[in-house]
A protein has these predicted regions:
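Conserved donor-binding/catalytic core segment of Leloir-type glycosyltransferases
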Residues: 108-120, 124-148, 154
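Acceptor-binding helix/loop patch of EC 2.4 sugar-transfer enzymes
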Residues: 24-70, 143, 219, 226-227
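A short, active-site helix/loop in glycosyltransferases that binds the activated sugar's phosphate group
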Residues: 33-34, 63-107, 155
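A charged, aromatic-enriched C-terminal amphipathic alpha-helix characteristic of glycosyltransferases
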Residues: 256-287
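Acidic donor-binding loop of glycosyltransferase active sites
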Residues: 186-199, 212
């Protein structure tokens, strides 16, 4: 509901009274995500910390004020303590809630309708043309570029493009309608997504369903929580420009691997994020809570 947190509490209480089971979704910015990032221990890096150092940013100050010291955070705590179950959609959100709510927490991956995801133009090719440049896609949201690390990733990519202009092609879109964004993405091989994440989020997951190779968070924890041991299609990058550059350079140096990574990306989504499998997991969790 587009209401202030203090006005939403009565709505939650009404829902609680009129439903046998109530669940909280841990899918994005909330008190426990902010708290975990700021403790500088739960994550090696996140939107809020790099190692033992808190990232000093105006937008983080805003989130801290809202979620740690404001009514949003108090409402979040109240619902988390009162609800019957909590669903975490990414490893990061699971880790954020697990310390306090392990007994009612369930990790269920984000859903992707794989069948409706259009494939990139070269998905069916088994060999990458030796003479063709690798096409990198970067979507920029001006107000979130620095927060999500797009600025750092783009600098590394531009450096590689300047050094190897015949082997690297950059497709950059900025603040465009979603349909135009999707069309531009389909002409590319590799998507650059978030720098400070352990896992691919919705934008990257959708791209993987379409056969793009994703440069984002692919830490071991993200595979372990899924039980994924045989494929590792995500190009994991550490949150610094030097590592991003090295990973991008390796993709260009070994571009013959791109078709395999493309197919593994699609397989990853089919296995772990298929919307019907996810729906069944929600139903199973709901039914497991007896009331």
């Amino acid at each position: 509901l587009p209401l202030r947190a203090e006005r939403m509490r009565p709505f939650y209480r009404w829902l609680r009274r009129h439903n046998r089971r109530v669940f909280l979704g841990a899918f994005g910015m909330d008190r426990y995500w902010v708290k975990a990032g700021l403790d500088c221990q739960t994550f090696r890096y996140s939107d809020f910390n790099l190692g033992s150092q808190v990232r000093q940013r105006a937008d983080n100050d805003f989130w801290i004020a809202e979620w740690l010291h404001g009514e949003k955070g108090r409402l979040n705590t109240y619902i988390a303590q009162d609800c019957d179950g909590i669903v975490a959609g990414l490893y990061e959100y699971d880790a954020s809630y697990r310390k306090e709510f392990a007994d009612k927490l369930r990790f269920i991956p984000f859903p992707i309708d794989v069948r409706r995801a259009p494939l990139i133009a070269d998905f069916d090719k088994t060999d990458f043309p030796a003479e063709r440049p690798v096409r990198f896609f970067v979507g920029v949201q001006r107000d979130r570029s620095s927060y999500k690390g797009t600025d750092v990733m783009l600098r590394a990519l531009r450096r590689l493009e300047a050094e190897r202009p015949d082997e690297v092609q950059v497709v950059k879109v900025e603040n465009v309608p979603f349909e135009e964004y999707k069309k531009a993405m389909l002409s590319c091989d590799v998507l650059l997504d978030q720098l400070y994440s352990y896992t691919p989020a919705m934008n990257a997951l959708q791209a993987m369903a379409q056969g793009l190779v994703v440069v984002s968070g692919g830490e071991p924890e993200s595979y372990e929580i899924l039980g994924c041991t045989d494929i590792h299609p995500i190009v994991n990058v550490l949150p610094n420009e030097a590592d991003v550059y090295e990973q991008l350079r390796a993709l260009v140096d070994h571009k013959a691997r791109l078709p395999q990574l493309s197919h593994e990306s699609r397989l990853y989504i089919e296995r772990y994020h298929d919307h019907l499998k996810v729906a069944q997991a929600y139903l199973d969790f709901w039914q497991s809570i007896g009331k």
